Amino acid sequence: MAEPLLTEHQHQPQTSNCTGAAVVHEEHTSERPPSAEERVPKEDSRWQSRASLQSGSRPGQEGEGGLKHQLPPLQTNACPELSSLEKGEKGQNGEDLSTGGASPSAEGEPMSESLVQPGHDSEATKQEAPAAGGEEPWGQQQRQLGKKKHRRRPSKKKRHWKPYYKLTWEEKKKFDEKQSLRASRVRAEMFAKGQPVAPYNTTQFLMDDHDQEEPDLKTGLYPKRAAAKSDDTSDEDFVEEAGEEDGGSDGMGGDGSEFLQRDFSETYERYHAESLQNMSKQELIKEYLELEKCLSRKEDENNRLRLESKRLGGVDARVRELELELDRLRAENLQLLTENELHRQQERAPLSKFGD
C-alpha cells in the first residue's frame, strides 16, 4: 500500500528552496487536525513527526497511518519543511487507507511498529554519534587550554639555617672563613671608592699572642698545695689565703677557674690544629725542627734544675737539723730559767724567817 505513495513523491519536482514545499504544505494543513497545529512548531521536523504520529494514533484513526508515520523520511536536499510535508501526506493517505477498512494491516500494526521503531532510533543515534564524538575532543581541548599548568616546583637548594651555637667546629670554621672573606671584599671595595675603612673586628691578634707563648697546660692536673702556716705568719694572713683558695676576685670558686682553664686549653688546641693544617710541607718541617731545638733546650734546663734541687735538698736537711737543735736549746734554756727562779725563791724564804 505504501509503494504508490512513494512513487508519487518521487515524481514530484524537488527544489532546493522551500517555496514550493511551503505551498504544498499549506494545502495539506487544512486537512490536519487543529490539535497538531497547536502543539507542533512549524519549522521543527522532529516535533512535526511526533504530532503526525499522535494524529495517526487518535481513537477512530487506527490503521496503517500509524505505521506509515513511523517510516523514516526520504533523504533529500530539501528543507525540513518538505520532509514534514511528506510525512503529513503519508499520514493523510494512511487515514484514507484506514477509512477504506483495510483490516489485515490493522491486525499487523503492533508487529510493524516494533520493527520500524528500532530502525528509526538507530538512525537517530547514528546521526547524533558523530556530533557527540566531535564535541568530546573539542571539549577536552578547551579544558586543557583553560587549565593552567602548575609550573612552580619546590626548590632543591633550601637553606637549612642553624644558630651559630649549634654549629659544629667544622661548620663554625667554614662560616668564619666565609665571613672574613666577605668582610675583606667589602673593605677592599670601600677603600677603592675612597670611603673610610675600619679594621676588621677580629680577635686574631690575641690568638697570635697565645701562639707565640707556650702556656703550661698541665696546671689544672695537679692539686694545689696547702699553705703551710709558719710561726711568723698571723691568723689574718691565713684567713686571706683561705679566701683566695675558695674563690677569686671574680666570685668563682675552684670549679669555675678549672672550667675557664679547660675551655682555654680546648680553644688553644683547636686553633693550633688549624694553624698546622694550613701550613705547607716545608713549613711543617721547619716547625718540627724548631720544636726539637726547644725540647732539647727544655731538657737541659730541667736537668740543671734537678741538680740544683738535690744540692739544695742537702742544705735544707742541714738547716732542718740546726733548727731542731735550736728548738731543743731554747727548751732547755727555758727549763733552766724556771729552775733558777725556784732556787732564788727558796733562798729568800730562810732569810725572811731569820729576820722575824
UniProtKB/Swiss-Prot annotation:
InterPro entries: HEXIM. This is Protein HEXIM1. GO terms for biological process: activation of innate immune response; heart development; innate immune response; negative regulation of DNA-templated transcription; negative regulation of transcription by RNA polymerase II; negative regulation of transcription elongation by RNA polymerase II; negative regulation of viral transcription; positive regulation of signal transduction by p53 class mediator. It is found in: Nucleus; Cytoplasm. The modification Phosphoserine is found at S98, S103, S230, S234, S249, S257. Pfam families: HEXIM. Residues 233-248 have a biased composition (Acidic residues). Its main location: nucleus. The lineage of its organism: Eukaryota, Metazoa, Chordata, Craniata, Vertebrata. Residues 283-311 are annotated as: Mediates interaction with CCNT1. GO terms for molecular function: 7SK snRNA binding; cyclin-dependent protein serine/threonine kinase inhibitor activity; identical protein binding; P-TEFb complex binding; snRNA binding; transcription regulator inhibitor activity. Residues 48-58 have a biased composition (Polar residues). Transcriptional regulator which functions as a general RNA polymerase II transcription inhibitor. Core component of the 7SK RNP complex: in cooperation with 7SK snRNA sequesters P-TEFb in a large inactive 7SK snRNP complex preventing RNA polymerase II phosphorylation and subsequent transcriptional elongation. May also regulate NF-kappa-B, ESR1, NR3C1 and CIITA-dependent transcriptional activity. PANTHER family: HEXAMETHYLENE BISACETAMIDE INDUCIBLE 1 (PTHR13469), PROTEIN HEXIM1 (PTHR13469:SF7). One of its GO terms (cellular component) is 7SK snRNP. The keyword Ribonucleoprotein does not apply. The gene is Hexim1. The coiled-coil domain mediates oligomerization. Residues 207-247 are annotated as: Autoinhibitory acidic region. Belongs to the HEXIM family. Residues 1-11, 24-47, 84-93 have a biased composition (Basic and acidic residues). Induction: Up-regulated by HMBA (hexamethylene bisacetamide). Residues 145-162 have a biased composition (Basic residues). Residues 147-174 are annotated as: Basic region. Residues 1-162, 210-259 are annotated as: Disordered. Residues 280-346 form a coiled coil. Residues 199-202 are annotated as: Interaction with P-TEFb. Residues 307-352 are annotated as: Required for inhibition of ESR1-dependent transcription.
